[in-house]
Amino acid sequence: DNSATRAALEMCSAASRPFAVLTKGGMRAADDFDIYEGNGWFGTTLAFTDDRSRQAWEPCAASVESRIEAIRTAHSLGIRTWVSMEPVIEPAQALDLVIELRHDVDEWRVGRWNHDARANSIDWTEFTSRAIRTCLDTGADFMLKEALHRYACPGAITRYVDGQVVARRTA
């Protein structure tokens, strides 16, 4: 039952207040897309292209296909879209999403895999560099989440919006 969520979104919309939604619910969230006009951002978490990986890590979340369909549907309706790319467990899959959804996502928020010793097997410096390069190469707006800043080279872009560098890593 999404009635409480819908009521909250309707209150924001009626008051002309901006809002952003982040969900793992996929197309279940599409029932509320009529409320987003002008004020809302629709977001989902995505870290995998392979639904078998998603099933192993997020068994109760909507499928990768359903989340991608929700992003594409929202974007086609003129709703601003964003993806929280985390936890990054399979770096290659995460970066493939940026390429696949480059025309449908207005902003990427790139994080890392925390709170699990297996995350130490990932070369976060390499991933951070590749994430920045992939976003820039596809023209994607992005923000590196704080957990990745230490892996970026000094001076590296950490936020990029509308073709403009908004923030860089300081030494």
Regions found by a protein language model. Name each.
Residues D1-C135:
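Conserved AdoMet/S-adenosylmethionine-binding subsite of the radical SAM
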Residues I122-A171:
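C-terminal accessory extensions appended to soluble enzyme cores
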